[in-house]
Amino acid sequence: DIALMSRELITKYPQIEDYSTIWMENITHTTAKGSSEFGLSNTNKLIRQYEYATGLKTGSTSGAKFCLSATARKDGVNMIAVVMAEPDSKTRIKDAIAMLNYGFGKCSIYQDEKALEKIVYAEVKHGMQEKAKGETLEGFRYVDTSGSDLSAVEKEVQIQKQTAPVKKGDQIGEVIYRLNEKT
């Protein structure tokens, strides 16, 4: 549940990282009696101890012990590690780092920002124009956890013949990616 909530937070509100990565901050508190400055430090020591750390939340009570929902980013891959009921703060950081390193060690990312390297056209039957220009709406990302050689990814562009009317936003084909004979 903690991992799911953390994923929702960092996905829907990525600006949380602007706050969760702050190590120390001086705050000025102003009242009618004047102002005073005091320092706040992040209780998530992972921020200082792990170069890929991006947050997120620590917690501890006598019942729950020491807990952490840790987020990190390395080579375009985001990870979440949740540790609970640790005996102390140092152990929670050590175990979170071990989990994150394990995850990053298992994951490789294949990314194709421009799925189409050239402009493609689909034939159009009964149209005012014989061809419709095609473009991709977004790039392609694949996270591999099997240790496959991602340089072996094959890409195939398939364009289907269209019948008029063809309007902007209509799908005229697809880009298919294969790795080890799997799509």
Q: What residue ranges belong to the model's regions?
A:
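Active-site loop and adjoining helix of the penicillin-binding protein/serine DD-peptidase-beta-lactamase fold
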Residues: 1
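Domain-terminus/edge residues, biased toward the C-terminal soluble/receptor-binding domains
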Residues: 4-183
